[in-house]
Amino acid sequence: MLMITSFANPRVAQAFVDYMATQGVILTIQQHNQSDVWLADESQAERVRAELARFLENPADPRYLAASWLAGHTGSGLHYRRYPFFAALRERAGPVTWVMMIACVVVFIAMQILGDQEVMLWLAWPFDPTLKFEFWRYFTHALMHFSLMHILFNLLWWWYLGGAVEKRLGSGKLIVITLISALLSGYVQQKFSGPWFGGLSGVVYALMGYVWLRGERDPQSGIYLQRGLIIFALIWIVAGWFDLFGMSMANGAHIAGLAVGLAMAFVDSLNARKRK
């Protein structure tokens, strides 16, 4: 899907969506801080942008109001669609995003039933030389979470960032970022604290770094992260490093993950520029 534009007024957004529907182009609206207009069929992007330019010149043109009536939006003439919570979740997340979320939830439930130690014996970073060829361990540490707040925080960010990467750049790109960041952030963290750690935060920080820098250097990629959020991520790293909140944080994984994401975004945006 491709985001075409955002409107501060949801009624204006609906007017444009209704008009394009009469032209045979289906757009959808997602409500965030503004009304974001999305196009599923990206092959029609140029046509939609041309119509948008005409619409913005005179959104009060009678043909747009007429389109709303044709689309069945009478009453005040316009209204914006409301999407149920789960529909919004489904629309943003691709299959890889969902598989990871489900896997983390299943592992979390197992940890509540069997105990943390029992699950860690199977999924933790290799804690004995005899386990170094159990290759899944270099990645499955990311599935383990030790509190409800821990898993909710990580999965919210994973859904928001991983879903955006998968929708815009494909499942393959999300898989590559996830595997590389899980491996390298885990390696660094075990150097800091030993093998007994877990959580998706190393991958989440990689996605933060990737989405932010890729959006800055390659806006046409369609992904972005507000600068305020990347500043928040850096503040959180500093807070964890100096133990300002008295919480046990995987500081090594956070720093390594962020570095991995930034490096991958730099390389990918460089390659994108070369292709132009």
From Swiss-Prot:
Give the record's membrane topology.
Multi-pass membrane protein
Q: Which reaction does it catalyse?
A: Cleaves type-1 transmembrane domains using a catalytic dyad composed of serine and histidine that are contributed by different transmembrane domains
Q: Where are the transmembrane segments?
A: 94-114, 142-162, 169-189, 192-212, 229-249, 250-270
Instruction: Please give an example of a GO cellular component term from this record.
Output: plasma membrane
How far does the signal peptide extend, from start to end residue? none
- Return the broad EC class: hydrolase
A GO BP annotation: proteolysis
Alphabetized UniProt keyword annotations = Cell inner membrane, Cell membrane, Hydrolase, Membrane, Protease, Serine protease, Transmembrane, Transmembrane helix
The record places the active site at 201, 254
Q: State the EC number(s).
A: 3.4.21.105
GO MF terms here are: serine-type endopeptidase activity
Where is it localised? Answer: Cell inner membrane
Query: What Gene3D superfamilies does this protein map onto?
Result: 3.30.70.2350, Rhomboid-like
* Family label: Belongs to the peptidase S54 family.
What's the stated role of this polypeptide? Rhomboid-type serine protease that catalyzes intramembrane proteolysis.
Q: What is this protein called?
A: Rhomboid protease GlpG
The species this protein was found in = Shigella flexneri serotype 5b (strain 8401)
- Name of the gene encoding the protein in the UniProt record: glpG
